[in-house]
Amino acid sequence: MPGLTIGDTVPNLELDSTHGKIRIHDFVGDTYIILFSHPGDFTPVCTTELAAMAGYAKEFDKRGVKLLGISCDDVQSHKDWIKDIEAYKPGNRVTYPIMADPSREAIKQLNMVDPDEKDSNGGHLPSRALHIVGPDKKVKLSFLYPSCVGRNMDEVVRAVDALQTAAKHAVATPVNWKPGERVVIPPGVSDDEAKEKFPQGFDTADLPSGKGYLRFTKVG
């Protein structure tokens, strides 16, 4: 469905949450945030996901990333459900806020509606959507999963690392990249510019085409 996507400014919505009223742009501030939706409280896959989010909170804190959840259940439902989440994974405290969107207007604006999943009243449910939003309030990366597939927190962390590395060093990250591994130099950077920008040097792959577009370097 059309809607919020990479490069768009996230709507500055204000919603009730488990931490009181939250205005999204104020919550972002000058940091990255992970804005994620879940189909419903007191459901099995969502319980495992939000418990994992809580367990990874320290990893996100290290990277200066804040978590912000949203679903269509009301705030009291969220608060009651958190007790189950924390009981399921003792030690994983849900310290991040979860916003309430019973009208479903926010999830529509955030492009988080699952077209195939509905509640008992026929109302659309949120998908397992996740937007990584940058300090400029723009969506940097989005994941969209169906209700039957839980998200992979290791991949979310890896994506954050890749985005922050790319932004800091003006590079790109190749397939399956992890921190400490080589990055690639974007094709818009000439070899002369690359020599200045990356004094540590770079390697160019020897390809049959003879085109020197695949260049690897290391960054700190």
UniProtKB/Swiss-Prot annotation:
Q: Which residues form a coiled coil?
A: none
Give its localization. Nucleus; Cytoplasm
**Catalysed reaction(s)?**
a hydroperoxide + [thioredoxin]-dithiol = an alcohol + [thioredoxin]-disulfide + H2O
Q: Gene Ontology terms, cellular component aspect?
A: cytosol; mitochondrion; nucleus
User: Which EC number applies?
Assistant: 1.11.1.24
- What are the recorded GO MF terms, alphabetically? thioredoxin-dependent peroxiredoxin activity
Active site per UniProt = C46 (cysteine sulfenic acid (-soh) intermediate)
What the entry lists under InterPro entries is as follows: AhpC/TSA (IPR000866), Peroxiredoxin_AhpC-typ (IPR024706), Peroxiredoxin_C (IPR019479), PRX_1cys (IPR045020), Thioredoxin-like_sf (IPR036249), Thioredoxin_domain (IPR013766)
A Pfam family it matches: 1-cysPrx_C
The record's principal subcellular location, in a coarse class, is: nucleus
**Which keywords does UniProt give here?**
Antioxidant, Cytoplasm, Nucleus, Oxidoreductase, Peroxidase, Redox-active center, Stress response
PROSITE patterns hit by this protein: THIOREDOXIN_2
Its GO biological process terms? cell redox homeostasis
Q: Where is this motif: Bipartite nuclear localization signal?
A: 195-218
Q: Where is the Thioredoxin domain?
A: 4-165
Q: Which domain of life is it from?
A: Eukaryota
Annotated family? Belongs to the peroxiredoxin family. Prx6 subfamily.
Role played: Thiol-specific peroxidase that catalyzes the reduction of hydrogen peroxide and organic hydroperoxides to water and alcohols, respectively. Seems to contribute to the inhibition of germination during stress.
Q: In the UniProt entry for this protein, what further remark is given in the free-text comments?
A: The active site is a conserved redox-active cysteine residue, the peroxidatic cysteine (C(P)), which makes the nucleophilic attack on the peroxide substrate. The peroxide oxidizes the C(P)-SH to cysteine sulfenic acid (C(P)-SOH), which then reacts with another cysteine residue, the resolving cysteine (C(R)), to form a disulfide bridge. The disulfide is subsequently reduced by an appropriate electron donor to complete the catalytic cycle. In this 1-Cys peroxiredoxin, no C(R) is present and C(P) instead forms a disulfide with a cysteine from another protein or with a small thiol molecule.
- The protein's name is 1-Cys peroxiredoxin A
Q: Which organism is it from?
A: Oryza sativa subsp. indica (Rice)
Source organism phylogeny: Eukaryota, Viridiplantae, Streptophyta, Embryophyta, Tracheophyta
